[in-house]
UniProtKB/Swiss-Prot annotation:
Name of this chain's protein: Lysine--tRNA ligase
Signal peptide (from-to): none
Catalytic activity, EC: 6.1.1.6
Positions of Mg(2+) 2 binding: E416
Free-text cofactor note: Binds 3 Mg(2+) ions per subunit.
Keyword terms, alphabetized: Aminoacyl-tRNA synthetase, ATP-binding, Cytoplasm, Ligase, Magnesium, Metal-binding, Nucleotide-binding, Protein biosynthesis
Taxonomic placement: Bacteria, Bacillati, Bacillota, Bacilli, Lactobacillales
A Pfam match: tRNA_anti-codon
Subcellular location: Cytoplasm
Primary subcellular site in the record, as a coarse category: cytoplasm
Cofactor(s), names only, from the UniProt record: Mg(2+)
Gene responsible for this protein: lysS
Residues that, per the record, bind Mg(2+) 1: E409, E416
Species of origin: Streptococcus suis (strain 05ZYH33)
Length: 496
């Protein structure tokens, strides 16, 4: 508990605590009991919003609702308030003559932020607002702190992230964004389940980081006296399940990478990985396009997705281009030609492309060219395929040109949204690539991984040809909610 709770109470907090004590003295539990509602605000509006004042009087419908008091006005013998539940707000009208004296005292002394239950008649005011004319009030919970910014929501960005509960109470746009996030994840599940995929769970604690190029968080298991890492990907465990015969699997879960934070990166994030036996990267391109298009249709409809003023043709076939061709389009440099590492380094110097100390292969320079010149041009959904072997340690080599792999990444609005490939199922080749990664790690590449011998052993039992995919859920949520920072789609982002 923070020291904030032990600081001197302000006047409002003192008054609210006095009201809490007064409720208890009247035999009313300040923090309430179970309460059964007959409807929420959205259901009432759907049922009665289009009815006239006279129609509602004739119908004589009653309802029982509950929620948080967000506004309150009126003095003397009558008053109005807006009650907020998960679906929105609805107005209540309370008149002293229509409720018990105790009930009216509850209403009079209620503060903004308190929870109440209301039973009454559904009606419309003279200005046409759907409301509940209260016949009975039930106190449900006392708010001991006042809500921020009564009418304008919570505007302080830092507080919105640190105290997400206040953001959700006061900013409906933020609340709805997280409802949409939940729907996005549900629709991805629905799509994959419909294709016969099994959702599975794999360990978060790993003995060896693997499945991605990233720096892990390291922890220690006291009972076993061993260092472990939080997973940087779910890939290697999911492929063990393909070895085990599950054929079509996916996992939606948290991934942890001990790296920098910016508008699109958080150390803890959500990804989905999908693996399909007897498939290749082209099948997985089709699957990826299907997942994205199905989810977009469910969330935003059949039209284009608008992101920061740019229309994304999400329902059109996605463009497909080889990485080497994309580089050639932007720079004129042709990496289809065979060349030495020194020749590639000279091209990099000529085009001001950075070459890292641990770069020892042409493929790494090709990838740097792509990042430097191509990524920023990819606005509409584009599959870039054919990544070099040097930057794709888990992908199968291309049959026609073994310098490259059967791998692709999906780019939208210059950002990577998915990474996929025909999986490497040759244990001898895989071991050689793991060993090359381990060497890069020794040379200072802190994103390179070591050798996972247990995974090699699993491959030695035989894995069928397989296609695999990873999609960043948070970035997809940003795209489909037109949000510019990952913190606005994470309920509790990492804070300093």
């Amino acid at each position: 508990m923070s020291t904030e709770h032990f600081e001197e109470l302000n006047d409002q907090q003192i008054v609210r605590r006095e009201k809490m004590t007064a409720l208890a003295e009247q035999g009313i539990d300040p923090f309430g009991k179970r309460f059964e509602r007959s409807a929420n605000s959205a259901e009432l509006k759907a049922q009665y919003e289009d009815k006239s004042k006279e129609d509602l009087e004739e119908l004589g419908q009653t309802a029982i609702i509950a929620g948080r008091i967000m506004t309150k006005r009126g003095k003397g013998k009558a008053g109005f308030a807006h009650i907020q539940d998960r679906e929105g707000q609805i107005q209540i009208y309370v008149r002293k003559d229509d409720v018990s004296e105790e009930n009216y005292e509850i209403f009079k002394k209620a503060d903004l932020g308190d929870f109440i239950g209301v039973e009454g008649d559904v009606f419309k005011t003279n200005v046409g607002e759907l409301s509940i004319h209260a016949r009975k009030l039930t106190h449900l919970s006392k708010a001991l702190r006042p809500l921020p910014e009564k009418f304008h929501g919570l505007t302080d960005i830092e507080t919105r992230y640190r105290k997400r509960y206040l953001d959700l109470i006061t900013n409906r746009e933020s609340f709805d964004r997280f409802v949409t996030r939940s729907k996005i994840i549900s629709e991805i599940r629905r799509y994959l389940d419909g294709l016969g995929f099994l959702e599975v769970e794999t360990p978060v604690l790993h003995n060896e980081a693997g499945g991605a190029a990233a720096r892990p968080f390291i922890t220690h298991h006291n009972a076993q006296n061993i260092d472990m890492v939080l997973r940087i990907a779910t890939e290697l465990h999911l492929k063990r399940l393909i070895v085990g015969g599950m054929e079509r699997v996916y996992e939606i879960g948290r991934i942890f990478r001990n790296e920098g934070m910016d508008a699109t990166h958080n150390p803890e994030f959500t990804s989905i990985e999908v693996y399909q036996a007897y498939a290749d990267y082209q099948d997985i391109m089709d699957l990826t396009e299907g997942i994205i298009q199905h989810t977009a249709k469910a969330v935003v409809g059949d039209g284009p997705v608008t992101y920061q003023g740019t229309e994304i043709a999400i329902h059109e076939p996605f463009k497909r281009i080889h990485m080497v061709d994309a580089i050639k389009e932007q720079t004129g440099v042709d990496f289809w030609q065979e060349m030495s590492f020194e020749e590639a380094k000279a091209l990099a110097a000529e085009h001001k492309v950075p070459v890292e100390k641990h770069h020892t292969e042409v493929g790494q320079i090709i990838n740097s060219f792509f990042e430097e010149y191509v990524e920023a041009t990819l606005i509409q959904p584009t599959f870039v395929y054919g990544h070099p072997v040097a930057v794709s340690p888990l992908a199968k080599k291309n049959d026609e040109d073994p310098r490259f792999t059967d791998r692709f990444e999906l780019f939208i609005m210059t950002k990577e949204y998915g990474n996929a490939f025909t999986e490497l199922n040759d244990p001898i080749d895989q071991l050689e690539r793991f060993e090359a990664q381990a060497k890069a790690k020794e040379l200072g590449d802190d994103e390179a991984t070591g050798v996972d011998y247990d995974y090699i052993e699993a491959l030695e039992y035989g894995m069928p040809p397989t296609g695999g995919l990873g999609i960043g859920i948070d970035r997809l949520c940003m795209l489909l909610t037109d949000t510019t920072t990952i913190r606005d789609v994470l309920l509790f982002p990492t804070m300093k």
